[in-house]
């Protein structure tokens, strides 16, 4: 396997993919913290792990190397104690701590562990009852900080490895995530990308040190020259235009077109890939609820303009826009839930539109969305069904749970 990144489509044969196996962080969700941690329910960890292992084995059985972000982080921090210390300092600063009693106590506690255990603990979260730290500040005794059981909050969304970063061509975006609950995830990515030999010299199109937000579920690689990005609850239009400029200007980038698709800004449709995915050269899944009653949706084609500016063309027909940027005479939009007014929103809620292509016309998706699965098969798609009862409680499907590192070029 070649090192680095090579993702020039959504559908090229999947050869290497980044995952995170759900761990103790999932059991550190409570009914009181679900909203803050972006969950609607609490998965049963034992079954979620079995389901995730089945998902990973499905990918391996079909020729993909599975790489775990927690293992990459462990390798980086084991190699350099200086990098480990720098990371911990960065992590604690972003969590709001400064040198002093709590900061020093957390540093001592985390560095006393093996590196593997430290990484697992960072994902799981550090409870206040794990450390004997004298509480002297009022904020430790009253208010929201005092009510929090954790010094470092758990990262239960981490099994959705799509979002903290996005492989794009030969490079990657490391993302400024929208909500604090997920921001440490892309900090881990930042240190892995900067220090792991696997990614030496990999270009970073955009790092996480921005004020505007973007998440990988909104970033779709349509082909070697075109990316689609959702204007969504989690990704801003300003970010998209800035990223387009960066891609157009960088000589290592092959991208000259960005298709911005505006979708409803709500939790059920948090990213573009929850309502729209590419599954073949000319076939896509789509949730019809992203369009108005007349079938219209705001779509914008961004291309290089004069004086390093970006030219923007506005359309309201998704199918026409896709045909234009992909140079296709026809394409097949396959509706989630067969477009049924009950089945479509039900199956979209359970990630029926969130499919992972592992080759052209061959996908992995949840078994529970049987209306969509049967329709996909009728349209000639080869479907690998994976278990979903617990993983799906996190509101993400097969694409959400995976970050391709290497795909064969088409």
From Swiss-Prot:
Catalytic activity: L-arginine + H2O = L-citrulline + NH4(+)
Cited InterPro entries: Arg_deiminase
Top-level taxonomic group: Bacteria
Cytoplasm found in the keyword field: yes
EC number: 3.5.3.6
Protein's cellular compartments: Cytoplasm
Enzyme class: hydrolase
GO biological process, one term: arginine deiminase pathway
Chief location category: cytoplasm
Transmembrane segments: none
Disulfide linkage: none
GO-annotated molecular function: arginine deiminase activity
Active site feature: 400 (amidino-cysteine intermediate)
Classification via NCBIfam families: arcA (TIGR01078), PRK01388.1 (NF002381)
PANTHER family named among the record's database cross-references: ARGININE DEIMINASE
Family per record: Belongs to the arginine deiminase family.
Protein name: Arginine deiminase
């Amino acid at each position: 396997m070649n090192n680095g990144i090579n993702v020039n489509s959504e559908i090229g044969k999947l050869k290497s993919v980044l995952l995170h196996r759900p761990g103790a962080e999932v059991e550190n969700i409570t009914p009181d913290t679900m909203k803050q941690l972006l969950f609607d329910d609490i998965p049963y960890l034992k079954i979620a792990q079995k389901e995730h292992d089945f998902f990973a084995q499905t990918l391996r059985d079909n020729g993909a190397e599975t790489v775990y972000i927690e293992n990459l982080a462990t390798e980086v921090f084991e190699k350099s104690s200086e990098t480990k210390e720098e990371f911990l300092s960065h992590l604690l600063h972003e969590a709001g701590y400064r040198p002093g009693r709590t900061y020093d106590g957390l540093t001592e506690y985390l560095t006393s562990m093996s590196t593997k255990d430290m990484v697992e603990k960072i994902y799981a979260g550090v409870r206040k009852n794990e450390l004997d730290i004298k509480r002297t500040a009022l904020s430790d005794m009253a208010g929201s900080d005092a009510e929090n059981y954790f010094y470092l909050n758990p990262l239960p969304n981490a099994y959705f490895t799509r979002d903290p970063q996005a492989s794009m061509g030969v490079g990657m975006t490391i993302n400024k995530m929208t909500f604090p609950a997920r921001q440490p995830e892309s900090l881990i990515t930042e240190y892995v990308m900067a220090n792991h030999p696997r990614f030496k010299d990999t270009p970073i199109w955009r790092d996480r040190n921005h004020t505007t937000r973007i998440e990988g579920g909104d970033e779709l690689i349509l082909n070697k020259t075109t990316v689609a990005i959702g204007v969504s609850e989690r990704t801003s239009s300003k970010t998209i235009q800035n990223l387009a400029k960066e891609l157009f200007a960088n000589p290592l980038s092959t991208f000259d077109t960005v298709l911005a698709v505006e979708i409803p800004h709500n939790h059920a449709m948090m990213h573009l890939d929850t309502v729209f995915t590419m599954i073949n050269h000319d076939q896509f899944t789509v949730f019809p609820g992203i369009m108005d009653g007349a079938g219209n949706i705001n779509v914008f084609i961004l291309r290089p303009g004069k004086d390093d500016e970006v030219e923007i063309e506005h359309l309201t027909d998704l199918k026409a826009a896709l045909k234009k940027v992909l140079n296709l005479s026809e394409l097949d939009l396959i509706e989630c839930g067969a477009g049924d007014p009950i089945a479509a929103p039900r199956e979209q809620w359970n990630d029926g539109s969130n499919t992972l292509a592992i080759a052209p016309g061959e996908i992995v998706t949840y078994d529970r969305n049987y209306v969509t699965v049967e329709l996909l098969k009728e349209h000639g798609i080869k479907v690998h069904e994976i278990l979903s009862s617990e993983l799906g409680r996190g509101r993400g499907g097969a694409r959400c749970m995976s970050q391709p590192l290497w795909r064969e070029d088409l």
